[in-house]
């Protein structure tokens, strides 16, 4: 009986060795040759030797077709060169290879690639071709503001005003971002809907009551609608929380000037000029901390997408 058991164990171990030999290595198995190729490829990419880096990354993928380091390297090379179709191919392979814990950063990258493809089509006057990419970007990451804005812009370019407004309104349920609200405000102004303009910012403020940028925007809308008392009240509320905000004093000066209160207007203008950047609301990058006077789709310092937020005073 014991001899039979030993025989079974021996046969089982033999089968296991055969199966192990036939099994493909894990995609990112850290063998010395792959690590050395990856090191050389990354070094070449960082030194600007793009062709050499690309050759080395592809060499890795010949034996390990789902190697994440090589795929990400090819994606980054393509993105740096503005070759977004190639970046998309690499990114789709990455999405297929990563585990669920890594999926979120990679879906953000997928949104970036689709956005850049759509943006290029839009800049070339091909709004119809841009829309599928821009919508794919929003599907990949619904918090990716540049794509949400551009979907509506593409519809507007095509003369599809209602579709543009619907796209921005859907996005506004997720984002309380000033560039998005500004587009909706412009659309409501064109439609002659002043109460909707006011409600737009009031609703956004209800969702984010500490957002002073939204509070100032509401005051600006009151001012532009000639609701001077409401505008003054709104700006004075903001002034209590942030007395050194130049934009508040610039608008208060304009309110007083419209009322004919020249001395008070002069004083507010003087304070705004002393503090600087009178009618601008500065933004700051969440990733690197760089400041910019206005919102942009990418940080001008670190070049990351969708990272600029209204700066807190």
Residue spans for each PLM region:
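Short coil turns that delineate tetratricopeptide repeat
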Residues: 65, 99, 142, 175-176, ...
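Alpha-helical segment of the N-proximal tetratricopeptide repeat
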Residues: 24-63, 79-80, 113-129
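Flexible helix-coil transition and linker loops at the boundaries of alpha-helical arrays
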Residues: 26-27, 97-108
